[in-house]
Swiss-Prot record:
Family, per entry: Belongs to the AB hydrolase superfamily. Lipase family.
Keywords from the UniProt entry: Calcium, Hydrolase, Lipid degradation, Lipid metabolism, Metal-binding, Secreted, Signal, Zymogen
Species name: Staphylococcus aureus (strain MRSA252)
Protein name per Swiss-Prot or TrEMBL: Lipase 2
Any one GO biological process: lipid catabolic process
Propeptide span(s): 38-296
Keyword Oxidoreductase: no
Biased composition (Polar residues): 41-72, 94-115, 125-135, 142-172, 186-196
Amino acid sequence: MLRGQEERKYSIRKYSIGVVSVLAATMFVVTSHEAQASEKIPTTNAAAQKETLNQPGEQGNAITSHQMQSGKQLDDMHKENGKSGTVTEGKDMLQSSKHQSTQNSKIIRTQNDNQVKQDSERQGSKQSHQNNATNKTERQNDQIQNTHHAERNGSQSTTSQSNDVDKSQPSIPAQKVIPNHDKAAPTSTTPPSNDKTAPKSTKEQDATTDKHPNQQDTHQPAHQIIDAKQDDNVHQSNQKPQVGDLSKHIDGQNSPEKPTDKNTDNKQLIKDALQAPKTRSTTNAAADAKKVRPLKANQVQPLNKYPVVFVHGFLGLVGDNAPALYPNYWGGNKYKVIEELRKQGYNVHQASVSAFGSNYDRAVELYYYIKGGRVDYGAAHAAKYGHERYGKTYKGIMPNWEPGKKVHLVGHSMGGQTIRLMEEFLRNGNKEEIAYHKAHGGEISPLFTGGHNNMVASITTLATPHNGSQAADKFGNTEAVRKIMFALNRFMGNKYSNIDLGLTQWGFKQLPNESYIDYIKRVSKSKIWTSDDNAAYDLTLNGSAKLNNMTSMNPNITYTTYTGVSSHTGPLGYENPDLGTFFLMDTTSRIIGHDAREEWRKNDGVVPVISSLHPSNQPFVNVTNDEPATRRGIWQVKPIIQGWDHVDFIGVDFLDFKRKGAELANFYTGIINDLLRVEATESKGTQLKAS
């Protein structure tokens, strides 16, 4: 019996040793993996890292398997002999277990010391692999830099920082190294740069487009940036354009004697518009549109200091002067610009001027729309062209309009030309009217006397034909089309019509006691049928060139232009309208697209791109959508908007489902924000002068 008890005690001791050994092995495996995790260092050599990580894992798995088998054998022995155990045997077992645990603890400490030593050796090996991989990556990057002639700043410091990571702290796994020809690849501890205000040259953009033709930047603003470089070199032609020869003027803008940048050349700008990917996103536009500041409940003072006056273009009818079925000019049904901006707390107005009148007549009407009073076209002008001197009477939105009290002017299409001419009259007057007044006496409108500076803060043009349009030369100003336009005016001038198309100064309004037959006979004798004092002529290349010669830049005004393009190059090299272009502009788009001069072909359906960028004889600079457009005395040319035709700027194409109201809201919000920056810049300048 004593022998049996001794055997059972021996079995129990063996079982205790096994249990403790299993626990020790488990602790060893956990400790080994923790040490391994803490010693991982970022490396660009994925193969070496994988090989290093697999070694301790395999050792741990082998140890665990061996200890599990030993534990299982001891467990089987315990099941056979453990049924007859006594309390005394249990006490002996506990004492033996304590003694054995002490011995096992010493063994574990010895094993851990050995493991730490092995891990240190592996760490040195991994560090060597990392240095070799890093050096190899640097040599590859140097080759890429030599190939693409691009500067990479900070790559050495980044590599050094990666090698000097504190080994006492767990490191973040290294990212896969991708060669970047524009800038150094960011490390895992530094987030990639998201700076969109840094300009790129056209050459860099073309290279990016070639490498990733289908890649789109979803973080870009609503308008596609064609020319994203801010050019500090002002472009000014020394020669004024010859009438009917604008192409020579544009080709000669950048003379070899002047410092120029191909990024600001009109031909290059249009070429970039062809190659640049379309990244306009209506989703992004909808998100940006939500940034519009709502009108506060107790707000009385508008958000903008100076009123914003929107001026429509050719064929435009607004407010009470628009027929029942005529679309809302500013925004259509997609986004009612005037109404929505007023809800946001902005002081905005839509001017109502002649839909068919000349820029001269429209400029005079615009002045009286703002100031108020009866329209005075001028005695000299009326005598020269043969229409009435006085027109309708405006109530005025700003009767106290005078120097120091300014307005912002935003013009679509022909409206941009009208704005420029009115500002010229305010500042420099009308020489013909001044001379006529001196010779004949009588009254003269304050508009024509000049000396009224500092009454306009900014001029913004949207798809304006500053240099004219071939569509007017070859279609709009033809005799047949003019007869149709004037016949429409004659019909709408009957006594029962409340619609004013803007030619009442020419007699296109039936008198109360006049029969319709007599009215037709009278109007048929009007000089308008053969006159150039109308919109059809002013939109031609010659008419626009004359306007450019009449106007100048005001150093106190911020000038900005927006341009769209909705055509593509066909197999024969001519421009064809894009799918989705407003159907009424298909013919005019093809007329422009088949011009003999290649740089004049790209268009928005009505206006060639080269004409909308800026007046050909005035200085300009290309700006991005990200930078504040607050410069004065120079045309700031915004990037060409891909896929926008002439009426997309005002949202009246009800058949175009690609252009959403949120996109239009974002566009006009951007304009308003620029105008607020102009006011802030002006206020800051005033404070600096006062101090």
